[in-house]
Swiss-Prot record:
Gene3D superfamilies referenced in this protein's UniProt entry, alphabetically: Metalloproteases ('zincins'), catalytic domain
Protein name as annotated: Endoribonuclease YbeY
Family: Belongs to the endoribonuclease YbeY family.
PROSITE patterns (alphabetical): UPF0054 (PS01306)
Cofactor note: Binds 1 zinc ion.
Documented EC number(s): 3.1.-.-
Free-text function comment from the UniProt entry: Single strand-specific metallo-endoribonuclease involved in late-stage 70S ribosome quality control and in maturation of the 3' terminus of the 16S rRNA.
Any one Gene Ontology molecular-function term assigned to this protein's record: RNA endonuclease activity
One Pfam assignment: YbeY
Length: 175
């Protein structure tokens, strides 16, 4: 079983403002990431598309950063006992609520221009990055960053989304 149940909340009409089938695109990309990190059980999560103003407020309130950002992850497992979670993680019938992503398409678009990556690539990068955070990956320490950005890079390449040249060396983060 390799299911990923995603609830979408679109406050900025991102999903409707395009001819692209973003829901399928997002689901397939995240299923690729899920497979790469060897999650066998069903996962559920929410993806919230919000304005620059809204993500700025969230970033300030929960992260103490007074600026808009591209993605904020609220992982359910943060603070939960690791042994408790691991006892169920290999059970294919266990449905794991991994948390909520808040994405700001406006900031992602700005980053795609700034980093010259193109919107689809930048959106995919941001989406996989947030998903990995929901699954306990981090990039505070160098060894953690190497693992996280390595997975992120592999998933993006396999999905046909090119890495920024600065990321080719061990999946280094450019922003």
């Amino acid at each position: 079983m390799n299911n990923l149940d995603i609830s979408f909340n679109d406050e900025v009409n991102f999903l409707k403002d395009s001819d692209k089938d973003w829901i399928t695109w997002i689901s397939n990309l995240l299923l690729s990431a899920k497979k790469e990190i060897h999650k066998e059980n069903t996962q559920e999560m929410s993806i919230n598309f919000v304005s620059s103003k809204k993500i700025h407020e969230i970033n300030k309130k929960y992260r103490g950063k007074d600026r808009p950002t591209d993605v904020i992850s609220f992982a359910i497992e943060d603070g939960l006992d690791e042994d408790f979670i691991s006892a169920f993680s290999d059970d294919p019938d266990f449905v794991e609520d991994i948390g909520d992503l808040f994405l700001c398409p406006e900031v992602i678009k700005r980053h795609s221009v700034e980093y010259e990556t193109g919107f689809n690539r930048e959106f995919g990068y941001t989406l996989v990055h947030g998903y990995l955070h929901l699954n306990g990956y981090d990039h505070i320490e160098d060894d953690e960053a190497k693992v996280m950005f390595g997975i992120q890079g592999k998933v993006l390449r396999e999905y046909g989304l090119p890495l920024h040249p600065d990321q080719e060396n061990h999946g280094k983060q450019i922003h």
